[in-house]
Structures are given as C-alpha cells and as structure tokens.
Amino acid sequence: MTYQHVLTDRCDDVVTITLDRPEKRNALALDVMLEVAAAFEAAGSSDALGVVLAANGPVFSAGHNFGDMAGADLDAARELFEVCHNMMDTVQAIPQPVVARVHALATAAGCQLVASCDLAVAGESASFALPGGKGGLFCHTPLVAVARNIGRKRALELALTGDPIDARTAADWGLVNRVVADAELDAAVTDLVARAGRGSALSKGLGKRGFYEQIDLDQSAAYECAGELMSTAAMTDDAQEGFNSFLEKRRAVFTQYP
C-alpha cells in the first residue's frame, strides 16, 4: 500500500515505518495518524520479525496538528483523539517488537508515540517534551503513555512545567532504552531490533500481548493472567521445539507465527 505521509520499507525480517512530513515537522494530523495505524496493521499481519518507527526531517514529531483542533467542534475533537488512541494501541497490539528510532525533538503526541513503542533508542541530540502545560491545552492523552513509562512525579514534572528533557535524562527516567551518538543511531537500532526479534515469532508475539495485558493489573491478577498464558503457550509446537532442542543440544528450528 502507498501512503502520502508515511514511508514503509522492508529489509530482511524488519519493516521500517517512517513519518515523512518534514515540512510540517511530522505533525500527527488526522490523515497522518490513520496512515500510521494502517502501516502498523500491515506490518503486524506480515511475517516480519521486528518493526522500526523512524522519522524524516528536522524533528521526530511535533505532536498533534493544531490546525485539526483550532475551531473544531466537540465531535471532531473526539474523533481526532479516538484516532490517536487507536494508533497508539495498534503499535502495542501488533505481535512484533516495535523500536522507536528517535532523533531531535519528540513533543506532545510525538513523545506519546515514543512511549507507546515497545523499545526506543535516541540519538544524543534528541529531546522530549509535553509542552501543553505552558500553553492552552494540557497534554492529557500523552500523559497516559508517558506516565506508564516514567511514573507519576516525573510525568507530571514534564506536563506541568512543559520543559523538555534531554536524551540522557529520558534514558535515566525510562522513556528510552539507550542513548547513542547521533552517527551511531541507525546501527544501534538495527542491533536492538534484531536481538528483540530473535527466537520464536509466536512466542514473542504471545509474550508482548501478555505483557500489556498484565502490566496494569494487581500482582495476584497479573500472575493469574501470565500463568494461564504461559501454560497454554507451553503447549505450542515452538515451545516444545525449544525444550527438545535444549535437551538434545541442537539449534532450535521455529516455524510458528502469531
């Protein structure tokens, strides 16, 4: 499928989805978000083993497009945020690990998009912000994903002050996994997505789904959820192949996909 504001490319087992509206600072307008969600759905239904989310241009993403919201009625605003929620949920719903490749600024819904990815690598010049606290519309929905990455106090500091944080701080707070020199960003992303995608694709997909199902439950309910999933997953052919290959001291051959 061809998109207007998104590029997709597959190299070996990895699909790269690239925000490609640099003249608008990759603002997440309604049509852009629909395309991003569609691109992730397509990648998720493929036999790819990993997905990279990247961006072209001077920033990763400037967040929501104010042009969509200025003068909008309540129904239009609700539609905009429903589409946004669907896009964020789709990133986490696909079975493959998703790695954000972050350069320059990721702000507001752009920061939310990074937080929604399973993993993230940032160049050392990257920065992150929830600037609504300095303006007229608080970053209500970006806080949903960001707070789940960095906790209440740090998320509220970002949102209430509107101040950006640098890449090293983002890593210390848990918003990104690691920070590398800008020149090493592509290599670091390639390495991480390859390592995150190895093993049984079915097992990895079930593992990702199970993580998001249990992570916000209380501990007892989380163990019940994870225990049932792990029990049923142990019955799959790939799980049995993993057990047998270990016992037989040979390389496993996995054949199942989500």
Predicted regions located by residue number:
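Conserved CoA-thioester-binding segment of acyl-CoA-metabolizing enzymes
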Residues: 1-56, 89
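Terminal low-complexity tails and localization/encapsulation signals of metabolic enzymes
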Residues: 1-3, 244-258
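Structural motif
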Residues: 14-18, 52-54, 73, 99-101, ...
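Terminal peptide-recognition signature
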Residues: 17, 21, 36, 53, ...
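Hydrophobic alpha-helical membrane-association signature
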Residues: 32-35, 80-83, 113, 185, ...
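Glycine- (often His-adjacent) and acidic-residue-rich active-site loop
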Residues: 34, 55-90, 106, 218
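Crotonase-fold acyl-CoA enzyme core
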Residues: 89-204, 231, 235-236, 241-244, ...
